[in-house]
């Protein structure tokens, strides 16, 4: 948008819709969130209309369901079609054959490029590897977080650990492990506060665990914020960040120590010796 392109976004909605609209980016609500056949048919109709009405020049998809639908539309409408591969999808149960990677694919790391070539036999020339771009003005050591500290009851002498991730069942393992470790961490540090940021289909289970630990400790050590857009302010008060991928890079930009850990692997406290594996796996530690 800043570079003069007219950007149109379609999604099932979420916390970032207002931010998009405030930036002058048009958003269309399309039920792209699951494999429900009725939703997929409705999405196909809506996407076809949007592409025609908005005179879209390039279509870019980021997930399996929209890519599948847009792949079918692409064959009839002949628009340029690009996808981004953010992680390694399950290829079993026939899922490989409903995955469409478009005419060209952007992979977020070298291991994802290898995955695409090995599992989908994509030519190397059709895959471009990029990195997550971080807004270093938004994510910086200078971020003012006084409003967040007031909202969450964080005191200046609190030892804050922040965890950021989607809390889907496929992503929430480390959130649960961190919560399980809180009683031991609480013995080792003063005034512990753990902020868990994110939402998803496993949120209620994570919250139940957090409530149980808080009850045992007799105070609200763990705070779940749900989905948020002010991630920079939630990172700012922490002494340690736990997470992967873009969120881990955002914490690094804010000059925070980062433990890289997720459902796909663990490489521990990040330092220069772990830079190569971080870059190769988009800081998701796949296979580690």
What are these regions (language model features)?
Residues 197, 206-228:
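Nucleotide-activated donor-binding/catalytic signature segment of Leloir-type glycosyltransferases, i.e.
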Residues 154-175, 179-182, 195:
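Conserved donor-binding/catalytic core segment of Leloir-type glycosyltransferases
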Residues 61-67, 85:
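Short His-centered aromatic/hydrophobic patch
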Residues 140-154:
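A short helix/loop element that forms part of the nucleotide-sugar donor recognition site in Leloir-type
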Residues 2-39, 199-205:
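N-terminal strand-loop element at the rim of the active site
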């Amino acid at each position: 948008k800043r570079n003069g392109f007219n950007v149109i976004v379609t999604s099932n909605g979420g916390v970032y819709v207002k931010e998009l609209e405030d930036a002058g980016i048009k958003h269309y609500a399309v039920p792209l969130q699951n494999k429900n056949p009725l939703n997929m048919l409705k999405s196909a109709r809506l996407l076809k209309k949007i592409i025609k009405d908005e005179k879209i020049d390039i279509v870019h998809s980021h997930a399996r369901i929209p890519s599948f639908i847009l792949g079918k539309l692409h064959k009839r409408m002949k628009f340029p079609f690009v996808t981004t591969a953010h992680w390694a999808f399950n290829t079993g149960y026939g899922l490989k054959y409903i995955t469409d990677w478009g005419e060209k694919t952007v992979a977020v790391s070298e291991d994802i490029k290898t995955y695409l070539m090995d599992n989908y036999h994509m030519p190397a020339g059709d895959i471009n590897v990029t990195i997550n771009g971080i807004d270093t003005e938004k994510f910086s050591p200078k971020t003012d977080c006084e409003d967040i500290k007031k909202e969450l009851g964080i005191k200046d002498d609190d030892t804050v650990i922040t965890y950021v991730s989607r809390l889907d069942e496929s992503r929430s393992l480390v959130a649960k492990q961190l919560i399980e470790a809180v009683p031991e961490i609480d013995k080792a540090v003063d005034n512990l506060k753990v902020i868990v940021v994110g939402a998803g289909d496993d949120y209620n289970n994570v919250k139940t665990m957090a409530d149980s630990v808080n009850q045992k400790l007799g105070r609200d050590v763990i705070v779940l914020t749900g989905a948020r857009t002010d991630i920079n302010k939630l990172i700012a008060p922490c002494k340690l960040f736990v997470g992967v991928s873009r969120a881990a890079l955002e914490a690094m930009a804010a000059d925070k120590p980062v433990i890289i850990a997720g459902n796909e692997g663990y490489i521990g406290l990040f330092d220069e010796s772990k830079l190569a594996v971080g870059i190769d796996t988009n800081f998701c530690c796949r296979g580690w």
